[in-house]
UniProtKB/Swiss-Prot annotation:
The modification Phosphoserine is found at residue 37. The modification N6-succinyllysine is found at residues 55, 66, 98, 204. It is an enzyme of class 3 (hydrolase). The active site is at residue 161. Belongs to the THEM4/THEM5 thioesterase family. Phosphorylated. The gene is THEM4. This is Acyl-coenzyme A thioesterase THEM4. Homodimer and homotetramer. Interacts with AKT1 in the cytosol. It comes from Bos taurus. It holds the Pfam family 4HBT. Keywords: Apoptosis, Cell membrane, Cell projection, Cytoplasm, Fatty acid metabolism, Hydrolase, Lipid metabolism, Membrane, Mitochondrion, Mitochondrion inner membrane, Phosphoprotein, Transit peptide.
Amino acid sequence: MLRSCTAGLRSIWALRGRREGAPRLSMDLQPARRLFSTEKVIHKDWALPNPSWSKDLKLLFDQFMKKCEDGSWERLPSYKRRSTQESEDFKTYFLDPKLVEEERLSQAQLFTRGFEDGLGFEYVIFKNNDEKRTVCLFQGGPYLQGVPGLLHGGAMATMIDIALGSCTGGAVMTANLNINFKRPVPLCSVVVINSQLDKLEGRKLFLSCNVRSVDEKTLYSEATGLFIKLDPEKSST
C-alpha cells in the first residue's frame, strides 16, 4: 500500500516538474532516504506516549513509571518488528522452511503495531517479575470499532492474548484462550488488563486476567489461557 502510494506521488511530482520547469530530485538519493525512514520506524519503541493518548492513559502511564523507579516493576518496550536475531532463531527452530516465503516474511510487522498513532492499538505493558503478573494499559482507536461506538470483541481478544503472553517471560504460543465478555468496551476508552501466572506444569503455563475500567468499577471481561513454552528440541521442523 505504502509503495503504491509512494509510486503514485512520484509520478505526480515528475509530471509537475516537467510542466512547471521545476528541478527533479535525483532518483539515486531516494532509496537511501526511504531506507533510513523505514529503519527509524522499525526501531522506534511504540510503548511510549504519543499525542493520541488520552489523559487517562497518560496518567496511568506516569503512575506505573513511578512504580518502576524502585525496580519492582518494569516497562516492556514494543517494536513493529522482532530483532533480526529473534526472527532467525524462530525460523531455524520452529518454522517449516517449506511454508516460509522469505520475501513476505521480511516485510512482516507486529499486527497490533501496524496502525498510525491513535487509530488502532495504543498500549503499554508493565511487568512485576516477583509477583509474576503484568498490567496492560490499553486504548482502542476508531479503526477497532465493532458495533457502532463500541470496541470490536476480536480487538479485545487480541489484547487479552498479548497481555497474558507477556506474563510468560519466554517464547510461547497460545494453546487455549477462554474469554467471558461481561460488558462492551466503549470505543477510544482506556481499560486496564491485569494478568497473572497461576500455575506452571512443565512447558504448560496457565494464566488468567481481567479487564476493567480505569476507576476499576466496571468489569468488561475475564479470561483464562493456556500457553506452551516452545522447545527447540521439539520443534515442528
